[in-house]
């Protein structure tokens, strides 16, 4: 193998070219590659953070839904209790009103009964007086007296 000046010149040119590339071309390429690697790593970590945030948000949403369901159930139970209380109060009020009306009606019936008895007593007294007057008018005849008394008893 012959080593001549051309090969030696090419080797020196190649070494100079490699040194030039290592000094001026390679650092910007490496910087661009490192920058791209950093951007990819940042993107991956950002995606991982976003996934964790999403999982956390889903967990929070699930917890809030559970809490909302519990609160809704509590509100429904309170509404049912309030409804039952209102119904009980209305029933009690209606019962009191019924008792008041019955008591008032009973008092009116008693008053009417007393008035009717008093009226009946007055009529009986008037009939007794009328009967006594008739007996006195016909006091001579004993058979007529017993007949008048029988009629009075029949009228009473």
From Swiss-Prot:
GO MF, any single term: proton-transporting ATPase activity, rotational mechanism
Keyword Ligase: no
Pfam families: ATP-synt_B
Transmembrane feature ranges: 11-31
Gene Ontology CC, one term: proton-transporting ATP synthase complex
Record key words, sorted: ATP synthesis, Cell inner membrane, Cell membrane, CF(0), Hydrogen ion transport, Ion transport, Membrane, Transmembrane, Transmembrane helix, Transport
Membrane topology: Single-pass membrane protein
Compartment list: Cell inner membrane
CDD domains: ATP-synt_Fo_b (cd06503)
Subunit text: F-type ATPases have 2 components, F(1) - the catalytic core - and F(0) - the membrane proton channel. F(1) has five subunits: alpha(3), beta(3), gamma(1), delta(1), epsilon(1). F(0) has three main subunits: a(1), b(2) and c(10-14). The alpha and beta chains form an alternating ring which encloses part of the gamma chain. F(1) is attached to F(0) by a central stalk formed by the gamma and epsilon chains, while a peripheral stalk is formed by the delta and b chains.
Function, in words: F(1)F(0) ATP synthase produces ATP from ADP in the presence of a proton or sodium gradient. F-type ATPases consist of two structural domains, F(1) containing the extramembraneous catalytic core and F(0) containing the membrane proton channel, linked together by a central stalk and a peripheral stalk. During catalysis, ATP synthesis in the catalytic domain of F(1) is coupled via a rotary mechanism of the central stalk subunits to proton translocation.
Family: Belongs to the ATPase B chain family.
Name this protein carries in UniProt: ATP synthase subunit b
